């Protein structure tokens, strides 16, 4: 009998999902991306060699694993082929193993132009997007004017839809942002020149997933970004433009909710955030700089430095609730090596409706509410020994084990996996999600 697992980030992204997905594909026959676009950045280290994927599922690095991009993903044709080319030059077979939903909305040059024009206009109030056109592409999807992947195979239909959205977006670019417009003919010619290279990978993904599941295949659904960036449940408006929670695995791939059996929530042993938005446990001191340096905290997509802070259990509890997390995987435990005293955020002081201060053990909804919160900490002793590469829980320093056990107690979810380094094999497994 097949078992299907959803892997999601429980923080603001960059939790180390790529490595864990790659590790789990040892027992999966298919890996599915179901939301986001090439704004995601999944870094994998295998045998000391680093690979960064933005759009293609992490399972592509495992021979004989089928990979799928579901309808919930927005696709840049050029970015897709750039990534395919990068993998093929590394000797990885992509074309026979990757299938992309014909219903995926496209990211076009007008979306990138609009994304960047908006960020410039916002000035100091910018959201901190990756500038890759993700948000505007999702807007077109919701407005029912998106160009979808299947439209590329019908020249006249593609031309008509492209003309419609360029009329709309060019008017905004020219008259509202005073920015250069996007040329229709150039966009059409450049996009159509890619069609024959993309065509072999396009398929009816919901049907393929249904058939694979019926045949007994284990499927792994790979989330991008993190639950606290979810368009509905995140720190709005400092969020991404898609649903990043486990439930999106169904709508973004076409598989039924009863076919999902386990949700693995990925969390760092501390907290990071890229771009703007409230971050109660953020550190601007030597500890924060230690975490950033040792954890190599720079965005895989943008290269921007990540903001670092203490572990925030109240934020994680919000993620656990909205995702129905079955178990946690704690990553980058080794980054905490050498920190003398650890602080674990267990909740917030916040103003109640009667303007009286109260304690909350769970993150409030919305950026404004979170920005007014003051974290409440518990202190625990750190450890001086190295945890790098440890694969057995009992071999961890006692202080590290106590730290993890306290995380479990506060968050009320079991820790099933622990990552002690960037390499695939530097992993402790307490309960295997597929078993």
From Swiss-Prot:
Self-association state and partner proteins as the record states: Homodimer.
Function summary: Plays an important role in the de novo pathway of purine nucleotide biosynthesis. Catalyzes the first committed step in the biosynthesis of AMP from IMP.
Record protein name field: Adenylosuccinate synthetase
Entry keyword annotation includes Transmembrane: no
Pathway: Purine metabolism; AMP biosynthesis via de novo pathway; AMP from IMP: step 1/2
Main location: cytoplasm
Cofactor binding description: Binds 1 Mg(2+) ion per subunit.
Entry similarity comment: Belongs to the adenylosuccinate synthetase family.
GO BP annotations listed: 'de novo' AMP biosynthetic process; IMP metabolic process
S-S bonds: none
Species this protein is from: Nitrosospira multiformis (strain ATCC 25196 / NCIMB 11849 / C 71)
Subcellular location: Cytoplasm
């Amino acid at each position: 009998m097949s078992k299907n697992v959803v892997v999601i980030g429980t923080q603001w992204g960059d939790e180390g999902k790529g490595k864990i997905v790659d590790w789990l594909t040892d027992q999966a026959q298919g890996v599915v991306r179901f939301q986001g676009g090439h704004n995601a950045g999944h870094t994998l280290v295998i045998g000391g060699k680093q690979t960064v994927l933005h759009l293609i599922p992490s399972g592509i690095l495992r021979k004989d694993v089928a990979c799928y991009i579901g309808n919930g993903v927005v696709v840049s044709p050029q970015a897709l082929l750039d990534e395919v080319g990068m993998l093929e030059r590394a000797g990885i077979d992509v074309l026979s193993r990757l299938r992309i939903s014909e219903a995926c909305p496209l990211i076009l040059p007008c979306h990138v132009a609009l994304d960047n024009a908006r960020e410039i206009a916002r000035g100091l109030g910018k959201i901190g997007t990756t500038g890759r056109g993700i948000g505007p592409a999702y807007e077109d999807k919701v407005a029912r004017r998106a160009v979808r992947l299947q439209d590329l195979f019908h020249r006249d239909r593609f031309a008509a839809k492209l003309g419609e959205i360029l009329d709309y977006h060019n008017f905004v670019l020219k008259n509202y942002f005073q920015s250069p417009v996007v040329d229709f003919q150039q966009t059409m010619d450049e996009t159509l020149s890619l069609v024959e290279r993309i065509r072999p990978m396009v398929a009816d993904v919901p049907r393929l997933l249904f058939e694979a599941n019926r045949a007994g295949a284990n499927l792994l659904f790979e989330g991008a970004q993190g639950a606290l960036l979810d368009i509905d449940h995140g720190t709005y408006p400092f969020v991404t433009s898609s649903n990043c929670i486990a439930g999106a695995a169904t709508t973004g791939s076409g598989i039924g909710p009863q076919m999902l059996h386990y949700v693995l929530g990925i969390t760092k042993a501390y907290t990071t955030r890229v771009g703007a938005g409230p971050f109660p446990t953020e550190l601007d001191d030597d500890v924060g700089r230690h975490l950033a340096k040792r954890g190599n905290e720079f965005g895989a997509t943008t290269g921007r430095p990540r903001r670092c802070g203490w572990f925030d259990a109240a934020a994680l509890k919000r993620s656990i609730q909205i995702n129905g997390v079955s178990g946690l995987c704690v990553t980058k435990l080794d980054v905490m090596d050498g920190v003398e005293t650890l602080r674990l955020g267990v909740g917030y002081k916040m103003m109640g409706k009667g303007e009286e201060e109260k304690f909350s053990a769970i993150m409030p909804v919305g950026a404004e509410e979170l920005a007014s919160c003051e974290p409440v900490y518990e202190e625990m002793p750190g450890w001086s020994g190295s945890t790098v590469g440890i694969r057995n829980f009992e071999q961890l320093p006692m202080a590290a084990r106590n730290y993890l056990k306290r995380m479990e107690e506060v968050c009320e979810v079991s820790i099933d996996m622990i990552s002690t380094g960037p390499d695939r094999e530097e992993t402790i497994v307490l309960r295997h999600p597929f078993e």
